[in-house]
Design a protein with these regions (language model features):
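Terminal leader/tail segments of proteins
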Residues: 1-93
Length: 93
């Protein structure tokens, strides 16, 4: 299971960016940096495949970026991941 802590969000060129700590099974495994500049987030390459597999378990079989954004949004909005997955599915169709 993945989660994030210490989320700091900010306005980037192409939306809201963030920096956070990524945890897998309650162990910090990476610091993620998404500057909302259209590029790939720093710090997730090593965990991309695992994030995609985790996405399947929560019903969100999309890219690691979308799955990570969903996790961050659930933490920032203080809602269960299942609630945020339902919101993402509405948007993603």
């Amino acid at each position: 299971m993945f989660t994030v802590k210490n989320v700091k969000s900010f306005q980037g060129r192409q939306g809201i960016g963030y920096i956070c700590d990524l945890y897998r099974n309650n162990e910090k495994v990476s610091t993620i940096e998404d500057y909302a500049d259209g590029g790939y987030p720093y710090g997730i390459t090593r965990y991309a495949a695992e994030l995609r597999e985790y996405g399947k378990t929560i019903g969100l079989a999309y890219s690691e970026e979308i799955i990570l954004n969903c996790i961050v949004d659930s933490v920032e909005n203080n809602v269960p991941i299942e609630t945020m997955v339902a919101e993402y599915k509405k948007f993603l169709g």
